[in-house]
Each structure stands twice: as C-alpha cells, then as structure tokens.
Swiss-Prot record:
Root EC class: oxidoreductase
Protein name as it appears in the record: Superoxide dismutase [Fe]
Required cofactor names: Fe cation
This protein's encoding gene: SODB
Catalysed transformations (reactions): 2 superoxide + 2 H(+) = H2O2 + O2
GO molecular function list: metal ion binding; superoxide dismutase activity
Length: 190
C-alpha cells in the first residue's frame, strides 16, 4: 500500500481572492505531494508501509517517517479546514468557543495572536484536550495527536502557505484565512 496525495476538496481557485489559485497549486501539488512521496519512499518494504498516517504519527517509528506522515496528515486536514462556501459557525459552536475563549471574536483574536506570534515554521491549532478547547502552536511537523489532543482546526504557518500572496506578512495571511474557514468541518470534529 502506498499513501496517496488527496485531491483538494474544492477547485484551486475556490478560495480566491483570499488564497490564490497559484498558492494552492504550489502548496498542494509541490509541498504536500513532496511529503507524501518522501513518506512512501521511507516506508516502502517495511512494516510501516501498511500503517495509517494516524498510526505512524502516534507511534513515531523514526523522526523522518514521523515528520513526513505528520506533514501529509496536517496538510490533508488543513485543506478540509477551508472552503470557498462562506460557512458561518453554528450557534452550538459559538457557544463552545464563548465558554472557552469569551466569544467568537475573542477566539479569533487569540488564535491569530498565537499563529502570528509563532516563531519559525509550524502550525496553529484549535484542539480538544481533556474535554476542553485549547489553542496551541506546534513547530515544524508536530501534530497534536502525538500528545493525545484532538485537532479541530488548523492553520498552516509555514511560509509556503502564504508567501506567494502576502510575502512575509503572516498577519495579512491570517486575516485572509479567516474568510475561508470551514466552520461546518470544525464542528464535525467535536
């Protein structure tokens, strides 16, 4: 069995004008594809070849396998966290975010601060941990499942996620990203 690059759940231009077609083509077809291809090369002919991405992330057989499996999973999840469909958060989700962070806008502010303030490459996440919602950032390929957390939403803060559109302005990227968050998908993760 080999791992496959999942198709985007929307057309390459579906997130415009917030995230460009060019960014999605490079990000998905080059960066994400590279992680999948490297992972296949690393696990070919080993007992790891028949495991799921989740198993490889949780078991972390080698650092190289972990990094590529986590990046493959993180990206597949990231694509689902976005849509060009203008989905708004439900009252139920807003209530949970309000209980945890003081309101939807307060959640977005705290998440943005964590994402923009992250030093270097990585990810910003909304996770469920011990029954509570938390905002965390992880470095490089680190996936929260490694620490027993359940991912609900993620934003890729590696520069390749935004450099074509906003150059080195991560804050501008986050401002655009909020316009394409797929709140329905987030709620389905709860």
């Amino acid at each position: 069995m080999s791992f496959q690059l999942p198709q985007l759940p929307y057309a390459y231009n579906a997130l415009e004008p917030h995230i460009s077609k060019e960014t999605l083509e490079f990000h998905h077809d080059k960066h994400h594809a590279t992680y999948v291809n490297k992972l296949n090369g690393l696990v070919k002919g080993t007992e790891q070849e028949h495991k799921t991405l989740e198993e490889l992330i949780k078991q972390k057989p080698t650092q190289a396998i972990y990094n590529n499996a986590a990046q493959a999973w993180n990206h597949a999840f990231y694509w689902k966290c976005m849509c060009g469909c203008g989905v708004k958060p439900s009252e139920q989700l807003i209530a949970k975010l309000t209980a945890a962070f003081g309101g939807l806008e307060e959640f977005k502010k705290k998440f943005t601060e964590k994402a923009v303030g992250h030093f270097g490459s990585g990810w910003c996440w909304l996770v469920e941990h011990d029954g509570k919602l938390e905002i965390i950032d992880t470095h490089d390929a680190v996936n929260p499942m490694t620490n027993g957390m359940k991912p609900l939403l993620t934003c890729d803060v590696w520069e390749h996620a935004y450099y074509i559109d906003t150059r080195n302005n991560r804050a501008a990227y986050l401002e655009h990203w909020w316009n394409v968050v797929n709140w329905k998908f987030v709620e389905e993760q709860l």
